[in-house]
A protein has these predicted regions:
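Collagenous Gly-X-Y triple-helix signature in extracellular proteins
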Residues: 1-316
Length: 316
C-alpha cells in the first residue's frame, strides 16, 4: 500500500530565496487539471487555456504557527495562496516516494527527465452523454454487474461560509464515508454519481455543465503519475479527489500525519487505488500496444493533455 502524501510549499514554490523547488515542478509547472470526479465532488476550477484547472493542497501551514487555521494551496492559476483548513473545495493531488514502489508500472512518456507512468486506478473522467444514457438504462433495469469494489468519498455537505461553519457542531462536519459502487459493462468499470445542486453548472470535460440530481457515469481508469527518479517523487498528473476537509481540529502545526485528509488517504484512497487487472496483462505481454489495453483512456488523455501515444515499457 502506498504512503500517499502532499507536496510542501517549498517543494512547489521554493524557499524565500526561490531555491529548492522540485525539478518535477520546474519542468511541469504548478497548474493542474481537475478530473471530472473531483469536480463532481465540489472541486473549484478555472478555465485556463481551454482546460479546467483546479486548486490543490500543499501540506504546509501558512505561518507555521501551532494555532494557525490556514494552509498554503496552489490555486487554479498555479500561484500560491492560503485557505482555512475546513474548506472542502480544494483538491487532492497525491504524491509518494517512488523508490518504495516495487510493483510493475507502465511508462507512457518521457521528456526532460520527467516520466509519465500508469499505476493504480480510480474514477476520473465522465462518460459521454450517449453512452451514459445506455449505462443508466442498464442500471435501472438491474442488469449492470457489481464488481464488489467501492470507492469512498466524504458525504458531508461542503460549507463555504465562515459564519455557517462557526455555528456547526462537531457531528455536522466530521468525515462521513460515502460509498460509490463499482459496476462493470463489457469489461469496463464505472461508478455512478448524481450531480449536487450546490455544484450546478460545473463544467465537465466533455463540455456538459453539471445539473442537479442528474446521474453521471465516471469511468474507472489508470492513474497517471509524473515521476522524477532522481528526486524519488511520483506526483499525480491530475487532481484526483475533492470534498474532504484538510483538518477539523483547531490549529495546524505542520504535523500532516494528524490531519483528516491524510487519514482519508491512508484509510481509503491508498487502498482503493491499488492495481488489479492490467498488471497481469503487462506481465503476460510486455510488447502490447498501449491502445489495446487502454484505448478509451488514451483517447481521453489525448483530448485533455494532447499526449502522444507510445509503446508500453515495463519499468519495474
Amino acid at each position: 500500500m502506498l504512503d500517499l502524501t502532499f507536496l510542501t510549499k517549498e517543494d512547489v514554490f521554493g524557499n524565500r530565496y526561490f531555491c529548492n523547488k522540485l525539478d518535477i515542478i520546474k519542468k511541469c509547472g504548478t497548474k493542474c487539471v481537475a478530473t471530472d470526479f473531483a469536480r463532481l465532488l465540489g472541486q473549484d476550477h478555472y478555465l485556463i487555456d481551454g482546460k479546467s484547472m483546479g486548486s490543490w493542497w500543499t501540506q504546509t501551514a501558512k505561518n507555521g504557527d501551532q494555532y494557525n487555521y490556514s494552509v498554503n494551496i496552489v490555486d487554479g492559476n498555479g500561484t500560491i495562496y492560503w485557505i482555512d483548513t475546513y474548506y472542502r473545495y480544494v483538491g487532492g493531488r497525491p504524491s509518494f516516494d517512488y523508490s518504495l514502489l516495487k510493483e510493475p508500472v507502465i511508462e507512457i512518456k518521457e521528456e526532460n527527465d520527467i516520466k509519465e507512468i500508469i499505476y493504480g486506478e480510480y474514477p476520473q473522467w465522465v462518460v459521454d452523454e450517449n453512452y451514459s444514457s445506455k449505462l443508466e438504462s442498464k442500471y435501472k433495469s438491474g442488469i449492470l454487474k457489481e464488481t464488489g469494489k467501492k470507492y469512498t468519498t466524504d458525504s458531508v455537505v461542503i460549507i463555504d461560509d465562515e459564519e455557517l461553519f462557526d455555528g456547526l457542531v462537531e457531528g455536522d462536519i466530521i468525515f462521513q464515508p460515502r460509498k460509490h459502487i463499482e459496476y462493470e459493462d463489457d469489461g469496463i468499470r464505472y461508478i455512478r454519481i448524481e450531480g449536487s445542486k450546490k455544484f450546478e453548472n460545473t463544467l465537465l470535460s466533455d463540455g456538459r455543465h453539471l445539473r442537479a440530481n442528474e446521474p453521471y457515469w465516471i469511468k474507472v481508469e489508470p492513474i497517471v503519475w509524473l515521476v522524477h527518479e532522481k528526486e524519488c517523487i511520483a506526483l499525480s498528473k491530475y487532481i484526483l479527489f475533492s470534498g474532504v476537509m484538510f483538518r477539523q481540529a483547531i490549529g495546524y502545526n505542520n504535523n500532516f500525519k494528524n490531519t483528516d485528509i491524510k487519514q482519508f488517504m491512508d484509510e481509503y484512497l491508498s487502498k482503493e487505488i491499488e492495481c488489479r487487472v492490467y498488471n497481469e496483462k503487462l506481465i503476460e505481454n510486455k510488447q502490447v500496444d498501449i491502445d489495446s489495453i487502454f484505448e478509451d483512456t488514451i483517447k481521453r488523455m489525448n483530448e485533455i493533455n494532447e499526449m502522444e501515444k507510445t509503446k508500453i515499457k515495463i519499468l519495474k
